[in-house]
């Protein structure tokens, strides 16, 4: 199938599920900042007037969880007249956190394949499969649909925070459909933006008039700025532009829908363009391979594409709880590779150390929250963990590895 339309979505930081991801990662940041060896599996639930923290945590850090939760909600924008039934200052915050299971801790602390190599002594925190992906559709080596959906969501939140469109409220979603011909992106077929808003805008009360006003404002202040540097741009005549298709979006956030950590895993990764192992990221410390190994898989895939050894690459890793080395490594270049997939796998095993402790050390995952002033993982909890132009993410820095792969691959050419 070479001619098709592919669609991906993103959501803003005010989406109920994303509120939860940010709170869970804010907890992780706070704990790692004080105690880099913290073991964290923090889940968050939000509903009208309620936030619940649950999960398992083992740490020497002392954190005021209630204050932290309220601060995150406030920074997102749920406060005062914009709260919509979920006010940072008055919502109930319940904390129900246990310690990590000693059975899990034992497997992480001392791997099954223990030896004199320190990196072999830390086992994976769970079994599982993780995928990483990269392609040459964008400068950041991400699929265009998810990249553009994130751009729109980021810009939508920006104009709200800057009060450029003072009727906007925190909840929102974007969706982008891209036309592909011969497997390459050629045009933007459809842009959809659903954004929460005040019931009245500058004296307008008619539902259709309000929707038309929002549509005009979003094209000017969101769509155009978010796409101005792209080679493929939206066309006001040819690109279908949908805004709040139900007519209005006044009730939103946790008042409209309950939220839960880990329910936007496709938004967090590749927008459905590549496979996903099923494990969420937010609220998990780096010993959880759901997170750290997914970052490593992206690192490997991006290095391959950056080295021009393939136009697209998907890497699968698998782990067993308590075992340091990956059970399997699989790479697929979708018939775009310049060397065989077997040879690529050989290079991956030689140039990438994919044991959990080695990944943590390579990316400095335990210490980044402290180095970044207590906010690192939380920033990844909205608008994707990969291809972020606005964040300094270690798994996106592939120049050195790409150069190594490019040089080493010459023996196979």
Curated annotation (Swiss-Prot):
Pathway(s) per entry: Amino-acid biosynthesis; S-adenosyl-L-methionine biosynthesis; S-adenosyl-L-methionine from L-methionine: step 1/1
Keywords on record: ATP-binding, Cytoplasm, Magnesium, Metal-binding, Nucleotide-binding, One-carbon metabolism, Potassium, Transferase
Predominant place of localization: cytoplasm
Gene3D superfamilies hit by this protein: 3.30.300.10
EC number: 2.5.1.6
Cited function: Catalyzes the formation of S-adenosylmethionine (AdoMet) from methionine and ATP. The overall synthetic reaction is composed of two sequential steps, AdoMet formation and the subsequent tripolyphosphate hydrolysis which occurs prior to release of AdoMet from the enzyme.
Name of the protein described by the UniProt record: S-adenosylmethionine synthase
Organism expressing this protein natively: Prochlorococcus marinus (strain MIT 9215)
């Amino acid at each position: 199938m070479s001619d098709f339309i592919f669609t991906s979505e993103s959501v803003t930081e005010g989406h109920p599920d994303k509120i939860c991801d940010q709170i869970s990662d804010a907890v992780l940041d706070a704990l790692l900042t004080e105690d880099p060896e913290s073991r964290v599996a923090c889940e968050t639930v939000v509903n009208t007037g309620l936030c619940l923290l649950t999960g398992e945590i083992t740490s020497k850090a002392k954190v005021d969880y209630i204050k932290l939760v309220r601060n995150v909600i406030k920074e997102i924008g749920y406060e005062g007249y914009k709260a919509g039934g979920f006010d940072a200052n008055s919502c109930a915050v319940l904390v129900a956190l246990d310690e990590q299971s000693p059975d899990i801790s034992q497997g992480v602390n001392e791997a099954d394949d223990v030896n004199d190599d320190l990196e072999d002594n830390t086992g994976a925190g769970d079994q599982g499969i993780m995928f990483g992906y990269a392609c040459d559709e964008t400068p950041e080596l991400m699929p265009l649909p998810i990249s553009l959906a994130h751009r729109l969501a980021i810009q939508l939140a920006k104009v709200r925070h800057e009060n450029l469109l003072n009727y906007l409220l925190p909840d929102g979603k974007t969706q982008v459909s891209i036309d592909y011909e011969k497997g390459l992106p050629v045009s933007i077929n459809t842009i959809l933006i659903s954004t929460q808003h005040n019931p009245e805008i500058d004296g307008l009360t008619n539902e259709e008039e309000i929707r038309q006003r929002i549509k005009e404002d979003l094209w000017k202040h969101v769509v155009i700025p978010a796409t101005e540097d792209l080679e493929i741009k939206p066309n006001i005549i040819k690109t279908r532009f949908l805004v709040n298709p139900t007519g209005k979006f006044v009730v939103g956030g946790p008042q409209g829908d309950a939220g839960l950590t880990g329910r936007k895993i496709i938004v967090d990764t590749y927008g459905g363009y590549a496979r996903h192992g099923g494990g969420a990221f937010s609220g998990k410390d780096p010993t959880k391979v759901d997170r750290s190994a997914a970052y490593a898989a992206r690192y490997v895939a991006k290095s391959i594409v950056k080295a021009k050894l393939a136009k697209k690459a998907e890497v699968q890793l698998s782990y067993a709880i308590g075992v340091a080395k990956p059970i399997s490594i699989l790479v697929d270049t979708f018939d775009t590779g310049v060397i065989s997939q077997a040879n690529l796998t050989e290079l991956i095993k030689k140039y990438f150390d994919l044991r959990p402790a080695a990944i943590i050390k390579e990316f400095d995952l335990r210490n980044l929250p402290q180095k970044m002033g207590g906010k690192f993982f939380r920033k990844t909890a909205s608008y994707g963990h990969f291809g972020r132009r606005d964040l300094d993410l270690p798994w996106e820095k592939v120049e050195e590895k790409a150069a190594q792969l490019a040089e080493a691959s010459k023996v196979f050419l």
